[in-house]
Amino acid sequence: MKYYLIAGEASGDLHASHLIAALKERDPEAVFRCYGGDMMQAQGAQLVGHYRDMAYMGIWPVLLHARTILRKMSECKRDILHWQPDVVVLVDYPGFNLKIARYVKSHTRIPVYYYIAPKIWAWKEHRIRAIRRDVDELFSILPFEVEFFEGKHHYPIHYVGNPTVDEVAAHRPTSATWQKPVIALLPGSRVQEIRGNLHRMLEAAAPFVRDYQLIVAQAPGQPDTVYMPIIEDCRRRFFPDVLMPVGLQSGGTFDLLSHAAAALVTSGTATLETALFRVPQVVCYYMKAGWLATLGRRLILKIPYISLVNLVAGREVVPELVADGMTPSRVRRHLSSILPGGEARQGQLDGYEEVARRLGSPGAPQRAAALMLELLRGAPLQS
């Protein structure tokens, strides 16, 4: 069969690459074409557009790059129409992907599958109408989404488990190369996130550099030039007398997390990855006009937490410092409490065990691939 996949950011590229691998195992004749990233391409998909050209967030960045985004969307629509796949598989990234779903349903008879459901339980709940109209099958990776979609909106979905469980379980760490214990800094995957978060993370962690090595996770596709000016500025300002206080780690976050004593993490999939590696963390996310962003969050978001760790647990397991709550002094205070010997460390580790139980066993990409093929072939679904 011919599969057309669309992923709009680094985490979607990772999850989609594992789904492609699982589909290839079950469909020897599978051919893949995608808008995505390097990992999808490495699995054999023909990459016709990279997510780097579409990964903008926030009102102003999106408006400033609206022409680019619209051009990429038009190219994607034309490519689907020309290639005529057997199925279009959308991976997260709802602002772009739901528009693609509308186009596919309006202009073709190609089925639309959605892997990693849009997070409409957080905001833009009205999108359920578009999902109901334009998405044939929805594959969820978060256990609490079943009650939201099926219980509240009477829209049937497939919970297949969480692929992050598989990815962490499959990782084999390399030998540590650092002389001191590590504090991992994960400032995000987009340029705007990195520029907003990294400086504040480094300032918060500065008092610990004599006992810990600070290692920044370099997001896939982001060059050194995004990070090094910030790192060098902070080195001069906050720890000029410490030899090599900050390192930049490329090649993914898993090796870094497997050796970290604690972490500062932006929201998103990275918070779940950090929890599954059993690394205590502080979730911190800077926004411009912080007090206004905090007010907007309270008015718009329909959820009590922003991190997947807390949402899966149904309670606060990790602290969340967002918008005007993310100050270096607050981050520093929480970081101190989760380092070895800190009073909050064991409570987080206990909470992580609860999160792992709720997510379930490995096998999410394989279960999703098997379900997709059964649906496409018209075979009866296995219970």
Regions found by a protein language model. Give the residues of each.
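Nucleotide-activated sugar donor-binding and catalytic core shared by glycosyltransferases
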Residues: M1-S383
